[in-house]
């Protein structure tokens, strides 16, 4: 059955000389895989250049019951980027976040609040002109709410440890595992949780501090998501914003 929907590109893979497989997070059906024809004709209904990391696509596809790949018939951009592909910092963030979402978001069902969050966040990054060095940290922290992984931050007291495995603060160092962060870093985590896109530029961080926060968040997700792999784009992102 032909249906129109919108999607955010997470991953592409060459299928053969005339097709690619594109994983998108869609407004209609959540995480979904599509077979996309990429003919060389300028008049083609689908162009491969559309499917860059985090690109917004409006498309029509044949959603057949029990299929694992849905064929895309027509596609176009519904929000052409103005800065992300042309800014090396933003494009590196987009590459990392697309890979992160590809590995973390597996739900194959409609989740319009999550789609709206992704759309709002990526458009915000594209339109922002300065002060976005902490964007990926805020994005990942807020994403945890949608995945049911948001940590319990209500019972924080100065000097607490943060237990990564049990997602909570604790006054004593965990004895049964080593997945925790020390009190000094736990205090910074709470500070990070107060950030949003509009205020994050007020929280100054060195590259080392930002890298450490990213490492902690990546470790946290790997603890709580089965089979979450090491991300190839993580090291590239750590080198940004000296």
UniProtKB/Swiss-Prot annotation:
<dbReference type="GO" id="GO:0006302">
    <property type="term" value="P:double-strand break repair"/>
</dbReference>
<dbReference type="InterPro" id="IPR003717">
    <property type="entry name" value="RecO"/>
</dbReference>
<dbReference type="GO" id="GO:0006310">
    <property type="term" value="P:DNA recombination"/>
</dbReference>
<keyword id="KW-0233">DNA recombination</keyword>
<dbReference type="Pfam" id="PF02565">
    <property type="entry name" value="RecO_C"/>
</dbReference>
<dbReference type="GO" id="GO:0043590">
    <property type="term" value="C:bacterial nucleoid"/>
</dbReference>
<keyword id="KW-0234">DNA repair</keyword>
<dbReference type="InterPro" id="IPR022572">
    <property type="entry name" value="DNA_rep/recomb_RecO_N"/>
</dbReference>
<dbReference type="InterPro" id="IPR037278">
    <property type="entry name" value="ARFGAP/RecO"/>
</dbReference>
<comment type="similarity">
    <text>Belongs to the RecO family.</text>
</comment>
<dbReference type="Pfam" id="PF11967">
    <property type="entry name" value="RecO_N"/>
</dbReference>
<protein>
    <recommendedName>
        <fullName>DNA repair protein RecO</fullName>
    </recommendedName>
</protein>
<keyword id="KW-0227">DNA damage</keyword>
<comment type="function">
    <text>Involved in DNA repair and RecF pathway recombination.</text>
</comment>
<dbReference type="InterPro" id="IPR012340">
    <property type="entry name" value="NA-bd_OB-fold"/>
</dbReference>
